[in-house]
């Protein structure tokens, strides 16, 4: 029966997405693959991806892909040319495979055309028939900082046998603090890009960011986890980008003014991006970019488009072409990254693009986020007019078609944590000591002399932590580690010292520097784009679109919140806010990034004290506290460490700030119930290169709850 079903499968067409096609002249046996991925699945097609290169003798290489419903590839195998791996895409290959059966599991792998080298095997599932009564089982998270490689938690995701995973941004970090991974060249300056800084060329951006994506797929320990390779192969994925894919400076604001010419989008490389890198974020005149074509947008600049292209090279993303919106210059001619996909009769998944069109992230004179009245400007946008109209119509159409659950992926939170334009005054928060101390290594031996400098040479710096105290012969009092250098063999200290080779240094733990999220930053909807946020939520409320769940990451904590809006549009007046009916947000993650690592005390009592301090401060400020305590249809609340979770439904039952985590969402047959389960591990230290530990730090269900649909 299985064979008969597979025989009916045929590849109707295969679209090559590998840049230029080259004649292959390389010795295929020397080619190596670093990972496979599949993504953007529909009912009938999917994107498959790999990278293949002969590192010793790089040259274009033709690559085949094999598809089968047999995981052993012993039966029913279809083989065809996927494309050519070459330098224009940093040797990545993508192919769009069509003609698949709906709601079916497939396996795939890549080979050189002579069959001498084969990649690992990947797995994906196509979306079920949009009218079928199908259960849906998916997960999401984001934020993978090289400081936390090899991303131990990510290795556990494939065991969940997901229909798909939503990788919600910050799929790499451009920063320099990760051992063995130097920083990228600068992409500009914040808040004023006119300040002279070394500015990357096109080739530098392409090479630097390609390297960062590659490193997300390579092991950091001998015979260790291949970072995100097992994760990508384990299920099909959807992907969004956020600030770190765009360099975390002015390019993160695709809809902001380019600041002069858009840079070299034409001409001969290397291009110099001294222009087209933005404007002064402190100047309120730049808060809204005119949408009449008079001012060029950052999303048209050479730097932005280079970073966007590298992101697409390294993700299994369907290339949907350029948007035709002549009445919307902000959007017209940009790559379409946003889309919606129906998963059976009861679920629609919507993936938005929250970076390409957004207005500038506003700054104060002191270079802090300006989240005050400037954020209430009704002309400011995060999504752009074309995407916002599309999103609203997509939600309306889905609701009118009877789709029960509407999941909207956004890369930045849309809930409200702190008072408008300000921060919470926490009530009885944990002390620094209660968060715990950092750094378990107590001594280390120098392997080189330090002659009145601030650089100490040792065998390895893996596992050392900034802030640890250092003492020993030649070390001044009150010396601490100030930086872990990327060479993996040196660290910096805060004092000059003369230390001989072979000296044993004593190390003391570092105090925690954890700072809770107590406000809505300028990157968030509430902190920087309040009017458009309000318009979207008002549209949902006014049209009685129920069972809407926003999915977000980027705050490096897991929390669940109801959403409030101002029916009369008074976005700067807290008293005007009311709840959006049957609508909430899940903020998830990180899968492996900083923030949670600054908490080493993982006790339930510590997390409860922190959650209570935030919730009490929110109540004092007339804000809705963390959690879903009064949400209609809420039942079966579970929380690790809290046997009374379903009875009390406290803020801590919907909150995890100290873990690496992802959330699994299940919609059962009939679409009546949504189940949300947070899975995670205790956070680990930066640059510790910690592998998954099933004995001492096993994945656990942190919390879970069920929501009954309405009506």
What positions do the PLM features span?
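Short, low-complexity interaction segments enriched in Ser/Thr/Pro/Gly
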Residues: 1-2, 20
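Bacterial N-terminal signal peptides that target proteins for export
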Residues: 2-13
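Serine/threonine-biased, Pro/acidic-interspersed low-complexity stretches characteristic
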Residues: 5, 28-29
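C-terminal segment of classical bacterial N-terminal signal peptides
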Residues: 19-26
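Short, flexible beta-strand-to-coil junctions
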Residues: 21, 473, 680-683
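Long, structured stretches of catalytic cores involved in phosphate-ester chemistry, encompassing
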Residues: 30-440, 467, 508-711
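Small/polar beta-strand repeat architecture
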Residues: 438-513
């Amino acid at each position: 029966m299985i064979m008969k079903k597979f025989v009916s499968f045929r590849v109707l067409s295969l679209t090559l997405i590998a840049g230029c096609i080259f004649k292959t002249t390389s010795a295929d046996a020397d080619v190596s693959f670093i990972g496979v991925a599949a993504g953007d699945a529909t009912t009938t097609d999917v994107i498959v991806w790999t990278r293949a290169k002969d590192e010793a003798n790089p040259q274009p290489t033709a690559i085949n892909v094999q598809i089968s419903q047999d995981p052993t590839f012993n039966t029913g195998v279809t083989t065809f040319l996927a494309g050519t791996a070459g330098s224009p895409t940093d040797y990545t290959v993508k192919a769009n495979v069509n003609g698949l059966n709906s709601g079916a599991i497939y396996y795939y792998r890549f080979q050189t055309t002579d069959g001498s080298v084969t990649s690992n095997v990947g797995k994906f599932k196509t979306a079920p028939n949009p009218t079928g009564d199908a259960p849906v089982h998916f997960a999401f998270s984001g934020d993978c900082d090289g400081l936390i490689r090899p991303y131990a938690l990510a290795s556990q995701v494939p065991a969940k046998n997901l229909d798909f995973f939503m990788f919600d941004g910050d799929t790499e970090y451009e920063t320099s603090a990760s051992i063995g991974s130097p920083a990228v060249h600068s992409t500009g300056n914040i808040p004023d890009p006119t300040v002279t800084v070394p500015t990357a060329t096109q080739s530098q951006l392409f090479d630097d960011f390609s390297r960062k994506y590659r490193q997300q797929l390579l092991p950091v320990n001998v015979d260790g986890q291949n970072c995100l390779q097992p994760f990508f192969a384990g299920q099909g994925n959807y992907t969004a980008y956020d600030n770190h894919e765009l360099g975390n400076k002015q390019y993160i604001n695709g809809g902001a003014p380019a600041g002069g010419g858009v840079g070299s989008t034409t001409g001969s490389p290397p291009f110099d991006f001294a222009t087209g890198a933005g404007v002064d974020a402190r100047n309120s005149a730049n808060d809204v970019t005119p949408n009449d074509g008079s001012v060029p947008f950052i999303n048209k600049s050479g730097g932005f488009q280079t970073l966007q292209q590298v992101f697409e090279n390294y993700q299994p993303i369907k290339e949907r072409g350029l948007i035709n919106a002549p009445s919307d210059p902000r959007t017209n001619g940009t790559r379409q990254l946003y889309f919606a996909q129906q998963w059976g009769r009861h679920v629609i998944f919507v993936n938005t693009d929250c970076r390409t069109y957004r207005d500038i992230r506003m700054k104060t004179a002191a270079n802090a986020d300006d989240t005050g009245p400037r954020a209430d400007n009704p002309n400011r946008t995060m999504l752009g007019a074309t995407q916002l109209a599309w999103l609203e119509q997509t939600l309306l159409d889905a609701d009118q078609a009877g789709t029960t659950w509407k999941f909207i992926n956004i890369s930045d939170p849309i809930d409200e944590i702190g008072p408008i334009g300000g921060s919470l005054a926490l009530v009885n928060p944990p002390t620094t000591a209660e968060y715990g101390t950092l750094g378990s290594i107590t001594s280390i031996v120098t392997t080189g002399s330090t002659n009145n400098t601030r650089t100490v040479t040792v065998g390895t710096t893996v596992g050392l932590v900034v802030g640890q105290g250092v003492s020993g012969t030649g070390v001044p009092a009150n010396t601490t580690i100030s930086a872990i250098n990327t060479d993996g063999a040196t660290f910096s200290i805060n004092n000059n010292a003369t230390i001989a080779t072979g000296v044993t240094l004593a190390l003391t733990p570092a105090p925690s520097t954890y700072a809770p999220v107590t406000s809505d930053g300028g990157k968030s909807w509430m902190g920087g784009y309040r009017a458009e946020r309000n318009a979207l939520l008002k549209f949902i409320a006014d049209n009685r679109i129920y069972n809407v769940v926003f999915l977000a990451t980027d705050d490096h904590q897991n929390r669940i919140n109801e959403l409030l809006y101002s029916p009369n549009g008074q976005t700067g007046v807290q008293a005007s806010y009311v709840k959006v009916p049957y609508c909430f947000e899940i903020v998830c993650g990180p899968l492996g990034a900083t923030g949670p690592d600054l908490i080493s005390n993982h006790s339930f009592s510590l997390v409860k004290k922190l959650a209570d301090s935030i919730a009490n401060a929110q109540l004092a400020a007339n804000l809705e506290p963390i959690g879903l305590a009064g949400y209609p249809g809420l039942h079966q609340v579970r929380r690790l460490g809290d046997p009374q979770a379903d009875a009390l439904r406290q803020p801590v039952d919907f909150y995890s700030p100290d873990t690496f985590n992802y959330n699994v969402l299940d919609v059962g047959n009939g679409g009546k119930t949504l189940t949300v389960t947070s899975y995670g591990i205790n956070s680990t230290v930066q640059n510790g290169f910690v592998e998954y530990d099933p004995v001492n730090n096993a994945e656990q269900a942190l919390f879970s709850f069920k929501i009954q649909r309405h009506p």
